[in-house]
Amino acid sequence: MSETAKKVIVGMSGGVDSSVSAWLLQQQGYQVEGLFMKNWEEDDGEEYCTAAADLADAQAVCDKLGIELHTVNFAAEYWDNVFELFLAEYKAGRTPNPDILCNKEIKFKAFLEFAAEDLGADYIATGHYVRRADVDGKSRLLRGLDSNKDQSYFLYTLSHEQIAQSLFPVGELEKPQVRKIAEDLGLVTAKKKDSTGICFIGERKFREFLGRYLPAQPGKIITVDGDEIGEHQGLMYHTLGQRKGLGIGGTKEGTEEPWYVVDKDVENNILIVAQGHEHPRLMSVGLIAQQLHWVDREPFTGTMRCTVKTRYRQTDIPCTVKALDDDRIEVIFDEPVAAVTPGQSAVFYNGEVCLGGGIIEQRLPLPV
């Protein structure tokens, strides 16, 4: 290998995407090393086992590829910069997205700094399904080639500088191709299922987990007409548009259409429900977003036409965006949208390019 080979540290999660990313970078002539991050300390045996198994898988892959694996503990950073904010949002009756925060504070901040400063890396790499393109001297974030797996929604907080220091090898591939490469190489992660659940906390029973940190406060479930029809176990367990877990059946009029959460009255600890997933109370004509992050880091002024996603895997919604001030925008959808949820992120696109996004501060309800 030449003296000039650039050094890349791959965030090895013990999953198939980061495993194949490491191999692809080797094929491209980079000097590759891996880094396994431990970001969660609190816990019961179950989570410890998951983390231990993931580390063992990451180590097995690195051994197979002949690369060094470093480990680092970012549990304090995760607790301070991700988890405490996550709890505060739930406490305020909003529904945060911890994966977005984790990418912002851990993977593309703590990891990026550690790789550059402690390990002498030129770049970091992750197994995210996104692409980068350098245009006019700035790195842009593009959707992953596999539209079914595209993860740009979770990376909208990244700046062009962070993207310039990051490589996303699987972003150019479809997921089945990634699995096929792993199988052909005989990697232990080839058939490992994709992780779901909260970022580094893994797949645990969410209600039970949240209950450890936030005391649940039961309260009334009320219909949009003001009838009390049940009791909820805590507003934090419910999100707009939710149907499951309400514990209420049909109505006295006999209609069997399912109930959906349409609003939360945090002040009075009341959950408001209506029947039908397209109930007018569930629809929004737009939203106000704050805590904005634009990938090019240029302040947004005036108005623009683009598309928006108000949750992961949603079909793009055509919209008009208008700057209200330095850190707030108003977004008006071309057509009403269901279940726009405060606390979640609104992420904007111009074709393949992810422009950035912000946190949904409030939804603009359909006038009824």
UniProtKB/Swiss-Prot annotation:
Disulfide bonds join C102-C199. GO terms for cellular component: cytoplasm. One of its GO terms (molecular function) is tRNA-uridine 2-sulfurtransferase activity. It comes from the Bacteria. It catalyses: S-sulfanyl-L-cysteinyl-[protein] + uridine(34) in tRNA + AH2 + ATP = 2-thiouridine(34) in tRNA + L-cysteinyl-[protein] + A + AMP + diphosphate + H(+). Residues 97-99 are annotated as: Interaction with target base in tRNA. Residues 149-151, 311-312 are annotated as: Interaction with tRNA. Its EC number is 2.8.1.13. ATP binds at G11, M12, S13, G14, G15, V16, D17, S18, M37, G127. The active site is at C102, C199. Keywords: ATP-binding, Cytoplasm, Disulfide bond, Nucleotide-binding, RNA-binding, Transferase, tRNA processing, tRNA-binding. Pfam families: tRNA_Me_trans (PF03054), tRNA_Me_trans_C (PF20258), tRNA_Me_trans_M (PF20259). InterPro entries: MnmA-like, MnmA-like_C, MnmA-like_central, MnmA-like_central_sf, Rossmann-like_a/b/a_fold. It is an enzyme of class 2 (transferase). The keyword Membrane does not apply. GO terms for biological process: tRNA wobble position uridine thiolation. Belongs to the MnmA/TRMU family. NCBIfam families: PRK00143.1, trmU. Interacts with TusE. HAMAP family: tRNA_thiouridyl_MnmA. PANTHER family: MITOCHONDRIAL TRNA-SPECIFIC 2-THIOURIDYLASE 1 (PTHR11933:SF5), TRNA 5-METHYLAMINOMETHYL-2-THIOURIDYLATE -METHYLTRANSFERASE (PTHR11933). This is tRNA-specific 2-thiouridylase MnmA. It comes from Escherichia coli (strain SMS-3-5 / SECEC). The lineage of its organism: Bacteria, Pseudomonadati, Pseudomonadota, Gammaproteobacteria, Enterobacterales.
